[in-house]
Amino acid sequence: MARRKRTALIPPPVRFGAWLRELREARQLPLRTVAAAAEMDQAHLSKVELGQRLLTPNQSKAIAVFFDLDTTDFEARRIVEKFRIEHADNPAAETAIHMLHDDPAVYRCKNQNAS
C-alpha cells in the first residue's frame, strides 16, 4: 500500500507565507536550503514568507516534495493565497467562494484532449 503524504502541520486559516515560514522553522532549516530545493532565490522565498510574493506552481510542487507534503494540498494553499491577494478588495469574492463550495464540479476545467 502506498504511503500517504503528510498534510500541513498548521491549520489553513494561517496565511500561506506565515505557514511556510513556520514549516521551515519547525525543521530548523535556513531559507537558502528550502530555496535551493525549489531552484529559486532565497530573497524571493523570503518575500513569499512575508506575503509579498507568490510561488509558481513548479516552486510549490518542489517545496511540497522537499517537505514530503501532499503536493495537491500544498498547491491548493498557494491558489488560496493567490485568490486572496488578487481578490481581497472585491466584494464579490465571498460570493464566488460560496459558489465554488456549493457546486465545485460546475467550475472544474475539463481536459479537452481526453477521449
Predicted regions and their residues:
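A short, Lys/Arg-rich alpha-helix, primarily the initiator
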Residues: 2-26
